[in-house]
Amino acid sequence: MSEKAYELAHIDELDRFPVDDEGLLWRPVRRRLGITAFGTNAYTAEKGDERVVEEHHEQDGAEELYFVASGRATFTLGDEEIDAPAGTFIYAEPGTKRGAIASEPKTTVVAFGARPGVPHEISAWEEIFVAFGHLRNGNEEEGRKAMAAAIAAKPDAWQGQFNAACFEALTKNSDAAIEHLRRAIELDPRAAEYAQKDTDFDWLRDDPEFPV
């Protein structure tokens, strides 16, 4: 019997990872379907009048296409504002500032992106976003597994260790938080500068073992 030749998922079946405390949800599509040629994710604003696409530029030449799957959004493209009801496609040229605010509750925007002529590189830090998404959903152990996978993918990068320290600080696991932060600083002293400003560590600063 041949291997399965397709993957199928309804948008309602996608993971729902909170991005913040305001109701914005990250709905991984590429990860769910195993796509490697381009990036694609969905974002849902549970409330109206909140950001559903962060304001940003694509400076590396990546092309991005957005599709409003449900609800309604107001896109900012350069200096223009565009009303985009459900069913609207929006393509932004590389370098164009873009972002979107949900005009209605439950607005979902699906984003697709890749750099022309360049093999798509899956972000090594995607699992970090998954880890914090699980944590915000109250699933600490699944979050810890995702964080471990991110570190294993890039063991010599300070960012993974730093984010693991933040994760453990948020779960009030002081020993693990300090251990990861020490390792991050060993890999790159910049981690100490970031730790000085990161409020995740505020409750740990009086600990004599805290390395900053």
Each model region followed by its residue ranges:
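Helix-start (N-cap) detector for alpha-helical repeat units in TPR-like alpha-solenoids
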Residues: 124, 158-159, 192-193
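A short hydrophobic beta-strand segment most commonly corresponding to one strand
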Residues: 104-120
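Short acidic-glycine-tyrosine-enriched beta hairpin
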Residues: 79-94
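A short, N-terminal "cap"/entry segment at the start of jelly-roll beta-barrel domains
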Residues: 1-56
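Short, conserved beta-strand element in jelly-roll/cupin
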Residues: 58-75
